[in-house]
């Protein structure tokens, strides 16, 4: 079994982002990715990861208004995992590598192949794209972060465009948009890191919360869902070998 610990926060209390790679225990097993709803923990990461791999996982495919889903049940006798959600539902479209192999409405035990734990900042220091978009009244433009990574094994570079948030820009300020992108955002981001969670997510640390980032607390972490963007790459390979080198910004008008 493989285990990975990504420490993006060193505090005594942190938010745990846990992802399992599992395989069904049956004659025609399906491979699944399971991510646990984030939870707060004060247990050391090294101790927590040891308990995370000693759980029993049951999976059942169900139908929901949001599409095919998986009902997950995690059983553990460890008090260390008392804060971790034990029953939850995730998207089958993101989770399943081979959905045709998973039976409908049958509870199946799974074997853990890999477990990843990422330590993030506490809940009130985390922000998502959804959080910011909901706070924008009559949005006119979108802010796109062009995050550049270098593969340290091959020296090749890749740029991942990520939607950050929508903003409202008045007509009189349109001419200054280019200046905003080069000055206001210049020092906003100190680093970006790809971690395994719900597939893959990008964690951006924001240092300057002026202007377009005014709803984000300084030094908070901004979580961007990459979904299946890198589904053909090994999660372990990407998280280990991709180094963030730069971030540029683009401000685009919202298209009808």
Swiss-Prot record:
Residues 1-110 are annotated as: Interaction with M2-1. Its main location: virion. A motif (Nuclear export signal) lies at residues 194-206. GO terms for cellular component: host cell cytoplasm; host cell nucleus; host cell plasma membrane; membrane; viral envelope. It is a peripheral membrane protein. It is found in: Virion; Host cytoplasm; Host nucleus; Host cell membrane. GO terms for molecular function: structural constituent of virion. This is Matrix protein. It comes from Bovine respiratory syncytial virus (strain A51908) (BRS). The gene is M.
């Amino acid at each position: 079994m493989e285990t990975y610990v990504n420490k993006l926060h060193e505090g005594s209390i942190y938010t745990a982002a846990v992802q399992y790679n599992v395989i069904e225990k049956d004659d025609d097993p399906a491979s699944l990715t399971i991510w646990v709803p984030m939870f707060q923990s004060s247990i050391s990461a090294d101790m927590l990861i040891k308990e995370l791999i000693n759980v029993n996982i049951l999976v059942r495919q169900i139908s929901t208004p949001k599409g095919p889903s998986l009902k997950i049940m995690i059983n553990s006798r460890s008090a260390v995992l008392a804060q971790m959600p034990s029953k939850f539902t995730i998207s089958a479209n993101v989770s399943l590598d081979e959905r045709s192999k998973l039976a409908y409405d049958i509870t199946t035990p799974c074997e853990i192949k890999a477990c990843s734990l990422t330590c993030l900042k506490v809940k009130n220091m985390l922000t998502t794209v959804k959080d910011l978009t909901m706070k924008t009244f009559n949005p006119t433009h979108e802010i796109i972060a062009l995050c550049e990574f270098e593969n340290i094994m091959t020296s090749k570079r890749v740029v991942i465009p990520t939607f950050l948030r929508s903003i409202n820009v008045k007509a009189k300020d349109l001419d200054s948009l280019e200046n905003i992108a080069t000055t206001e955002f210049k020092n906003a981001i100190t680093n970006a890191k790809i971690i395994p969670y719900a597939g893959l997510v990008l964690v951006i640390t924001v240092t300057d919360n002026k202007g377009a980032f005014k709803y984000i607390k300084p030094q908070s972490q901004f979580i961007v869902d990459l979904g299946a963007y890198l589904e053909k790459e090994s999660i372990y390979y990407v998280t280990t070998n991709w180094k963030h080198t730069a971030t540029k910004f683009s401000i685009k008008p919202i298209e009808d």
